[in-house]
Swiss-Prot record:
Binding site for GTP: 13-15, 26, 72, 102
Matching InterPro entries: MobA-like_NTP_Trfase (IPR025877), Molybde_CF_guanTrfase (IPR013482), Nucleotide-diphossugar_trans (IPR029044)
Family: Belongs to the MobA family.
Main location class: cytoplasm
Descriptive protein name: Molybdenum cofactor guanylyltransferase
Organism: Pseudomonas putida (strain GB-1)
Matching PANTHER family: MOLYBDENUM COFACTOR GUANYLYLTRANSFERASE
Localisation per UniProt entry: Cytoplasm
Record remark: domains: The N-terminal domain determines nucleotide recognition and specific binding, while the C-terminal domain determines the specific binding to the target protein.
EC numbers for this chain: 2.7.7.77
Length: 191
């Protein structure tokens, strides 16, 4: 990674129930001949020496794609905010790139743009499509961990709302930017 970018950890969230996938673990579902998480891992691997996957099941399968695997502190799939908190606790670098396991079209250019924006403003950076924030495409300073923990303790479960408690820089992306496609149903995997 160019010197202009701070060292970063990568946090891939793969801890969901997969309800729209019939309960299947989305990150391990095949797309174009390999698991979805493998596509994301291949893009981000050159960017970091600390790839963390937050998952609540199939941890052994995910170990093949990560330097560290963590689970949520609470059982029963508490949601992405819990996964981010768990991942930030073990991340080795002060900046953390946050991605979902089911976004195989993400590319290094998008990640580098987020890192550049975060570093320039010394704050979190998140993709924004018009009025809509996309928290699963973010760069976070590790120092937001206490803010997220406080939000969790206060009953907040929305990752986006918790992240927006602090300054966040928006990286504008078009509504139809295919790099942001995530696969939330079996039908979307057919494309």
């Amino acid at each position: 990674m160019p010197d202009a970018f701070p060292p970063c950890s990568i946090l891939i969230l793969a801890g969901g129930r997969g309800q729209r996938m019939g309960g299947r673990d989305k990150g391990l579902i095949d797309w174009q001949g390999e698991p979805l998480v493998a596509h994301v891992q291949r893009v981000v691997r050159p960017l970091s020496d600390d790839l963390v996957i937050s998952c609540n099941r199939n941890q052994e399968a995910y170990r093949a794609y990560a330097d560290q695997v963590v689970g949520d502190a609470e059982a029963d799939f508490p949601g992405p905010l819990a996964g981010v908190i768990a991942g930030l606790k073990v991340a080795r670098h002060e900046w953390v790139v946050l991605l979902a396991c089911d976004a195989p079209r993400v590319d290094q250019v998008l990640i580098e743009d987020l890192l550049r924006l975060a570093k320039a403003n010394d704050s979190a950076a998140m993709v924004r499509q018009g009025e809509y924030w996309q928290p699963m495409f973010s760069v976070l300073p590790k120092r937001v961990l206490p803010v997220l923990e406080q939000a969790w303790a206060a009953g907040e479960r929305s990752l986006q709302k918790a992240l927006l408690r602090e300054a966040v820089q928006g990286l504008a992306c078009a509504d139809d930017d295919c790099r942001l496609s995530n696969f939330n149903s079996p039908e979307l995997l057919q494309g």
